[in-house]
Amino acid sequence: MMADGFPWLTAIILLPLVASAFIPLLPDKEGKLVRWYALGVGIADFVLMCYTFWHHYDASSATFQLVEKYDWVPQIGFSWAVSVDGISMPLVLLAGFVTTLSMLAAWQVNLKPRLFYFLMLVLYSAQIGVFVAQDLLLFFIMWELELVPVYLLVSIWGGQKRRYAATKFLLYTAAASIFILIAGLAMALHGDNTTFDIVELGAKNYPLALELLLYAGLLIAFGVKLAIFPLHTWLPDAHGEASAPVSMILAGVLLKMGGYGLIRLNLELLPDAHIYFAPVLATLGVINIIYGGLNSFAQTHMKRRLAYSSVSHMGFVLLGIASFTDVGVSGAMLQMLSHGLIAAVLFFLAGVTYDRTHTMAMDNLGGIGQAMPKVFALFTAGTMASLALPGMSGFVSELKVFIGVTTSDIYSPTFCTVMVFLAAVGVILTPIYLLSMLRQVFYGTGAELSCNINNGAYENQEDEGTACFGTDCLLPGEAVYRDASIREVFIAASFLVLIIGVGVYPKIATQLYDVKTVAVNTQVRQSYTQIAQSNPQIYAKGFFAPKIVEPEVMAVSGMIK
């Protein structure tokens, strides 16, 4: 029910969208007023989220809260239905936090600033809409609405191959989202009543064959967004060409839509099919971890290396979802939140580095840590978080996933051991490619007495208008020595404070969703028990779980032993 009779979630969704409509009316050609206006709207919406959840959300309840439902097209059962629970509420806060800081990170945008901030606010609303939609058709509309601003943000404000990267992103995600629409229609039309309400869809009984088809289709749709191998190839191109603020949202929020969809629809609505697909998810998770790590190490472009790092880290989300344990599913949720913060700050700092050096080629960098010590220190802290250093949020989330897989009583010990061992190999790769990136970019001997910039000799290395770092000295002539500004330090520090806070005291985050993840995992385990009784060969032959043994009847007492 609506708290105090006020539609809080609707207000949170519509505030950025309605505010974006006034941007063309602002008397501002250079964008100075527009950026302050957009930032103010973002802050106001985030404050509204915090107020709403602080006063009207009960973290001890696993049910949907702040429910709003208004009939939209009653003839087909379509309604404006929104709500939050332990799965969606933390992701709403993540979206608000990352998007607001990304608008602050875009302070230097001077190309079509009105259009840029208009698209950022529309994207803000679409992200929130995806996470709070309780109607599957509304979920699909919000999912599609998010594609348009991202496409334009990449294709207009991106790099040299921006149109290729934006088109690839659009084709992948739009084609995959067709499966959401098909699955939604199939579930809505099944049975006697036609409805798109997610709660009512979860109460329907689907034939197992239909569930398996629905699960497979949704896995493809969400797998593209989550960058699951082999559906991930759009991600490195998009990150490589997108501006830093857009990359912050891509890695910090949009990837998490895929993980959210898997938990919300695949696990909650199709638990029987999840029993059969869980080993596939676990295997894909391990492949993601290793494949992403190896490819990341092979990249010489800084943002492409970080993009493949995201592919690797999303493998832990799949492992946790497939673990059948409370701690594993909780770890998957924490990994999404943790990676959202870590990836956002790393892509932001990569953008800060690019603003100074005008290159993402790590081979052309080296020694810039001497000239930009603040950027170096912040980048090092973000890197330590990404490689799961104890005391950082990444360590807690990955540890919980490992514990979840190790303690799973559904799979056989052999399968658990293989999965944990292979995932551990991927964890070993992480410091290799991240620390080597730090070495290439920030360490080195510093500037030489003479260096070649744009094929021109610069003898005076004291000129602050010239940046000649490292041994190659192939930076553009417009590169500068300038260290991080107060604004840039504030943005990075805002992320790092949360990363360290969750790493030191994980309950800051886990208390928001643990009740819900336990409820979801309990539902899936109940489905496993029912299926195992009727099909004792499930996960048989020793590779997965042992065969279910029939209860033994005691001859004397007639009791079940």
From Swiss-Prot:
Under catalytic activity, the entry for this protein gives: a plastoquinone + NADH + (n+1) H(+)(in) = a plastoquinol + NAD(+) + n H(+)(out); a plastoquinone + NADPH + (n+1) H(+)(in) = a plastoquinol + NADP(+) + n H(+)(out)
Q: Which InterPro entries match?
A: NADH_Q_OxRdtase_chain4, NADH_Q_OxRdtase_chainM/4, NADH_UbQ_OxRdtase, ND/Mrp_TM
Q: A Gene Ontology MF term for this entry?
A: NADH dehydrogenase (ubiquinone) activity
**UniProt GO BP:** ATP synthesis coupled electron transport; electron transport coupled proton transport
Q: What class of enzyme is it?
A: translocase
Pfam families given for it? Proton_antipo_M
Q: How does it sit in the membrane?
A: Multi-pass membrane protein
The UniProt entry lists the main location of this chain as: membrane
Q: What is its EC number?
A: 7.1.1.-
Q: Where in the cell is it found?
A: Cellular thylakoid membrane
Task: Name the keywords, alphabetized.
Answer: Membrane, NAD, NADP, Plastoquinone, Quinone, Thylakoid, Translocase, Transmembrane, Transmembrane helix
Report the transmembrane regions from the record. 6-26, 36-56, 87-107, 115-135, 136-156, 169-189, 209-229, 243-263, 274-294, 311-331, 332-352, 375-395, 418-438, 489-509
Q: Which family does the record claim for this protein?
A: Belongs to the complex I subunit 4 family.
Matching entries from NCBIfam families are given as: NDH_I_M, PRK12561.1
Q: What does this protein do?
A: NDH-1 shuttles electrons from NAD(P)H, via FMN and iron-sulfur (Fe-S) centers, to quinones in the respiratory chain. The immediate electron acceptor for the enzyme in this species is believed to be plastoquinone. Couples the redox reaction to proton translocation (for every two electrons transferred, four hydrogen ions are translocated across the cytoplasmic membrane), and thus conserves the redox energy in a proton gradient.
Q: What is the official name of this protein in its record?
A: NAD(P)H-quinone oxidoreductase chain 4 2
Q: Which organism is it from?
A: Trichormus variabilis (strain ATCC 29413 / PCC 7937)
Q: Which gene encodes it?
A: ndhD2
